[in-house]
Amino acid sequence: MTYKNILDKLVGKWIHQRTSYFIHNQQIDYHQEEIKLKQIDNIYISTKDNNSLYQYELSNKINNQKIYYIFSKQEESEFGKLHKITNDEIKYYRFTIHTHNCIKIESVRENISYNEYIYLINNRFKITISILKRGQKYLATSFISEIKIFN
């Protein structure tokens, strides 16, 4: 599966269930929501040759929040860049196609590392596992399951 094919499979309306476990206080958080990811073309960014650029908008029906994602990758590079844009901040990540059906997203800042694995089980089901660590010590983990809905 190619870079573009994997990103295309993320687009759509999803029922999103997240369970997060915070190790230091043994707290478990759970929530469910309906989200929609669509590809957009209205963000202006100049591109260089041999650089693939894909822009997405993630919207949450409940709180009307919108998050923008910009994926960029040079053709010859194994890694790509991911920018997550919200109302008050921009976060920077790098990503790679980890396996034929998995995207790995990672970020390191001040000895804290974030790793996220998005597994595309099939066209209607995906699982995401996220891990937050300080050095070699685990801080939190998260499990997300998403089912694509059509209506």
Curated annotation (Swiss-Prot):
Keyword annotations of the record: Chloroplast, Lyase, Plastid
Subcellular location: Plastid, Chloroplast
HAMAP family per record: Chrphore_lyase_CpxS
InterPro entries given in the database record: Calycin, CpcS/CpeS
EC number: 4.-.-.-
Cellular-component GO terms for this entry: chloroplast
Protein name stated in the entry: Chromophore lyase CpcS/CpeS homolog
Record keyword NADP present: no
Family: Belongs to the CpcS/CpeS biliprotein lyase family.
Gene Ontology molecular function: lyase activity
Role this protein plays: Might function to covalently attach a chromophore to Cys residue(s) of phycobiliproteins.
Native source species: Gracilaria tenuistipitata var. liui
